[in-house]
Amino acid sequence: MFNIYLENAFYLNGITFAKLPEAYSIFDPIVDVMPIIPLFFFLLAFVWQASVSFR
């Protein structure tokens, strides 16, 4: 089982897990940023609560 984990970890070590088709290569920078977008909403919740004094 440990060997299976090591084999799978070998493939997941890169920053990008998949390559977009060539027709969509212009969207590569956007796709790289997309996983971070939910974190912005999470941080926005704290900024919003700070603006209303955490009521």
Swiss-Prot record:
Q: Which residues are annotated as pro-peptide in the record?
A: 1-18
Gene Ontology CC: chloroplast thylakoid membrane; photosystem II reaction center
| Sequence intervals crossing the membrane | 26-46
The topology of this chain with respect to the membrane is: Single-pass membrane protein
Signal peptide region: none
Q: Where in the cell is it found?
A: Plastid, Chloroplast thylakoid membrane
What biological-process terms (Gene Ontology) are attached? Answer: photosynthesis
Q: Which UniProt keywords apply?
A: Chloroplast, Membrane, Photosynthesis, Photosystem II, Plastid, Reaction center, Thylakoid, Transmembrane, Transmembrane helix
Record-linked NCBIfam families: PRK02553.1
User: Could you tell me what this protein does?
Assistant: One of the components of the core complex of photosystem II (PSII). PSII is a light-driven water:plastoquinone oxidoreductase that uses light energy to abstract electrons from H(2)O, generating O(2) and a proton gradient subsequently used for ATP formation. It consists of a core antenna complex that captures photons, and an electron transfer chain that converts photonic excitation into a charge separation.
Subunit structure of this entry? PSII is composed of 1 copy each of membrane proteins PsbA, PsbB, PsbC, PsbD, PsbE, PsbF, PsbH, PsbI, PsbJ, PsbK, PsbL, PsbM, PsbT, PsbX, PsbY, PsbZ, Psb30/Ycf12, at least 3 peripheral proteins of the oxygen-evolving complex and a large number of cofactors. It forms dimeric complexes.
Family named by the database record? Belongs to the PsbK family.
Provide the protein name. Answer: Photosystem II reaction center protein K
**Which species does this protein come from?**
Marchantia polymorpha (Common liverwort)
Question: Which gene name belongs to this protein?
Answer: psbK
